[in-house]
Structure formats: structure tokens, C-alpha cells
Amino acid sequence: MANLVFICASEGNNALLAREVEAHAVAMGHSVEHVSLNEYDFPIYTVAREKATPVLEGIDRLVEVLDRGEAWFVFAPEYNGTCPPVLNNTIAWLSREGDDFRRLFRDRVVALGTHSGGGGNHVIMAMRMQFSFLGCVVIGRSLLTNKKKPANPDTINAIPVSYTHLRAHET
């Protein structure tokens, strides 16, 4: 089975959703490692700050964890119709690592999920565009939940199965 990295862009309901999905993924034989982007607390990315910061504390550790994942599941709330700032900022810093900004992302299988106050469709669309642009293979089915709509167990189970199917086609 796959080594999965669950990336959380919030500590609240999205972290709880990630734990719920983890239980299903582990029951299917996958291993799961969690990354909380808030724990890294990277400064806001700017070109000037990048030049002034030859070594960004924590970035190597984050790259190492993300590299271990054969696939990622990104959980993020919707902020003003798009991704939360911590996700955009982290991606900005990650894309500046090394000579090839897509190296970490290229051909990486990515699933998307959200627990949002609204519908969550906008953050899913924004993440789908961003991760696709970076070279990821984004799974078509997404997990959208909110206070009135609990996580769909069929979707929770279908997404880890998608990882398995995609890996089977790689060999």
C-alpha cells in the first residue's frame, strides 16, 4: 500500500477530518504521516525575504516529510473563496527550493479535502488548479464537508482506493 502524507492547513475541523480519513486509510493498509503547516510558521514569502534568508528554518524537514509521501492528501478550509494563506505561503517557499521548482510536486498524486464554513467548492478548485500547475496528479474526487454536511464515507473510502489504482498503473 501507499505511504501517504496528510497536509493540514488548519488545526480545527480540517485536522479532525484528516484524522477521520486516516482511520479509513490505515484500515486499508496505507501508512499515514501528518504535516501541520501552522507548526512551521514560515514568514510571508517575498523575493527580498528569500534573498535575505539563505536558510529557511524548517524547510528541509518539511521537504523530507513530503518526499516520503507517495501521495498527499491536502486538507484546507476556504478563505475568502480560495486557499488559506498558510497553504499559499508554504507552497511559495517550497517552490523556491532547489533549481527545479516542480521537483517536489511533479507526478505526485494529490487528493483534496475541506471542511469549510461555506460549501468549500472554491478552495477545492483553487487547490486543484495550483497543484495541477505544479505538476501533481490531482485525484478527480474531492472530500467536501461542513457543519451541515458530514463527510461522505463512500468518498472517504474511494480516495485511498484511487491511490492504489494510480500506483498500479505506474508499474
Model-derived features: where do they sit?
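Helix-loop-strand module that forms the ligand-binding subsite of alpha/beta enzymes
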Residues: P54-L134
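Residues at the starts of beta-strands that form the adenosine-phosphate
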Residues: N3, S31, V109
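Active-site-adjacent alpha-helix of alpha/beta-hydrolase-fold enzymes
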Residues: E22-A25, Q130-V137
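Conserved small/polar residues in nucleotide/adenosyl-binding loops
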Residues: T164-T171
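Cofactor-binding loop segments of dinucleotide-utilizing enzymes, especially the Rossmann-like FAD-
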Residues: A9-S10, L37, H115-G117
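N-terminal beta-loop-helix "entrance" segment that forms/cooperates
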Residues: N38-P54
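Mobile beta-alpha loop/short-helix "lid" or hinge segments that flank ligand
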Residues: V35-P43, F133-A151
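N-terminal beta1-alpha1 ligand-phosphate binding loop
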Residues: A2-M28
